[in-house]
Amino acid sequence: MCTRPGLAALLVLMTSCASSFSRADTQSASAAALSAASADAQAARQQQEQHLVAQQQQQQQQQQQHSNNNEPQQRAPSLDPYYRSLLDGSQGGQLFAPAQPVSQPDLSPDFSNPMGSSLSQSGTPEDSDTKVDTRGAAPKFFGKKRGQAPRFFGKKRAMAPKFFGKKSSEFPTSNSEQLALDTRGSPRFFGKKSFPESNREQRGSPRFFGKKRFDENVDIDERAAPRFFGKKSSGESAGDSGYISVASRGSPRFFGKKQDDDIMIAARGSPRFFGKKRSDDNVALDLRGSPRFFGKRQSSDLDDEISVALRGSPRFFGKKRADDEDILLGERGSPRFFGKKRANDENISFSLRGSPRFFGKKRSDESDDDNIGLVARGSPRFFGKKRSDETDDENIGLMARGSPRFFGRKRSDGLDDGGNIIDVATRGSPRFFGKKRSNSDSSDKSSDSALSSSESGRQTRQAPRFFGKRYVDEHHVSKRAAATAFPLIIEARQAPRFFGKREYRYPPRGSPHFIGKRFSLYRSPGKYSLSSPYMSAKEFKETFRRSDPFFMGKRTAELNEEGSDDFTNDDTDDENEYDETVLFKRGAPRFVGKRGAPRFLGRRGAPRFIGRRGAPRFVGKRGPPRFIGKRDLDWYQKALCAEADILELDDCADFLGNDDVKRQAPRFIGRKRGEDVSERDYAQLLEALSRLQAIKQIKARIQNEKRLWVPGMVGRRSEYNLGPFDEFVDESMER
């Protein structure tokens, strides 16, 4: 089989021979040559078409092999459209043999262009007549080009775009066209789809994640079940699918396994369900509203009714009750429960409802919990392990509710006289981080008095928020150090959040012991207080307006405290010597040492300047502006002298010596060559200057003699288009 360049050369040879035979002298010789050439041309055309078809098939096979191996294809050169039209007989149906062979440079430019058009690019020779110039173009093409489907990655499947998952392979052949229409529009389908008979409503089930139902009839309600995560109901009978109403359609955000029985309207609205749901027969309307359920629900045989209480238990995390008692209304409201709930068989009253935000393990002792009052509800934000002693908790009062934001381990010892009373004192220690007292020594005067009296309880509550060790640097206040040392600071002047082991002394001092400067006493608690590492001038002045903030010492006392010296023993203090009326006032701090003026290195005075302040210095001599090149002022001086004549000046030198004329910097940088301005241009320049002189003379004459104002021209007037103005000039000149 011949190659394509040899084939094209043969065709060109035949055409050139035909053109040489056409120039024969006699008509009989030309007719004989034409008949012989036409017969040979028909045979040659059939043979060449067969070669082209065989070669095209072979090239397609080679392209498929190369595309499978991901190798770039190099196009073979194609025929020129003119010679292809000769083969097709579109140029009159005559083909002439050449007299002389044609050399290679006389061929089509496609032979030298490997990216030119070819017959293998399109299907038929008719389509290949139109040459598509793709030289330098044809970008953005990846893979094998077949027809007109560019930018296609992967395996194409008829009408199912955007289908992710396992497609059904058991469709009957009769319904394949209908299913192609329905399957096309099912966007965002993730998982395994249903493959029995389905109608058009199955098309629109958006955002389906998981395994769908396998019943035969899928109605319009199941179509729209959005955001379904998990395994749906797999009832096999057609009657079960009939119960799927509009309610089952809208069950949004379902995570877990749904029940396999009759799905009523209640199952529709259970939003945000995480875990395993109940699998009993009748799910009432109350089951609908239990939102945010995380964990395993009860699987007992409570088939009668689940009351409204079960419906409203929001934000339940963990394992719910599995007992068979009646669930009262109080059970409903235990919101935000994290951990394991109580599993005893006592009646839980309305007070248990409100223990919000409980993190950890609740009490599971066998004590009598019948009378847990309303106060047990309110222990909010408890993080850690609660009390697990077996004391009598009948009288847990209202104060147990309010111990807010306790992080760590609570007291697990026996409380005062059997732990019957927990008063305000335990409640009020806010924002305590660390380990509380866990000793069971009830002989301590301070602890016994604190737990038994509400007055000392108020004092315990006022322990301020203190973080560890204060700063001991002496001079400047660093905001950046404050940002690192107080990461959770809210109000800097509150001495916030104590980390470590706190020593409980009753009554406590109003401020913890610290050595160092009074850091955050005069800081503004705004949101920009930690933005700069230095104090502003205003803050520096405010420190001196109130008191000197730079001190070293130990603060041990309250405000207006009498009868106490600097070196008292804290362990031997008696609580009776403190007056309760001044407990919440902050007194002047005690200082161990001598307070003096702040230290300054050197003398504070005017700012220093190195050198003499004076006029700005200039290096060299200030002179006229510099010009790069040679200034040619011949024509410029002529123009200025013309201006001097217009202004009726006697001497042109006086005009050139004027300061206004000198101040006009010439708009020329460089050297002006003489050959740039020809004689013709110079003559036109002189003519323009003369016209300008005449125009200005006319304006001056009209303005001076007739006292008339003629507006000047704004812009630039071309010297070649002064026809109408010349008539006006001539009329004025005649006057």
UniProtKB/Swiss-Prot annotation:
The modification Phenylalanine amide is found at residues 142, 153, 164, 190, 209, 229, 255, 274, 294, 317, 338, 359, 383, 407, 433, 467, 499. Residues 1-20 form the signal peptide. It is found in: Secreted. The modification Methionine amide is found at M552. The modification Isoleucine amide is found at I515, I610, I628, I669. Residues 194-204, 438-447 have a biased composition (Basic and acidic residues). The modification Leucine amide is found at L601. It comes from the Eukaryota. Expressed in the CNS and peripheral tissues (the digestive tract, vasculature, and the reproductive organs). Residues 66-76, 101-125 have a biased composition (Polar residues). Residues 21-135, 168-184, 194-203, 214-229, 233-249, 259-267, 279-287, 298-311, 321-332, 342-353, 363-377, 387-401, 412-426, 437-461, 471-493, 503-509, 519-546, 556-585, 632-661, 674-705, 715-735 form a propeptide. Residues 142-159 have a biased composition (Basic residues). The modification Pyrrolidone carboxylic acid is found at Q462, Q494, Q664. The keyword Hydrolase does not apply. Has some structural and functional features similar to vertebrate opioid peptides. AMRPs are inhibitory on Aplysia esophagus, penis retractor muscle, and body wall muscle. This is MIP-related peptides.
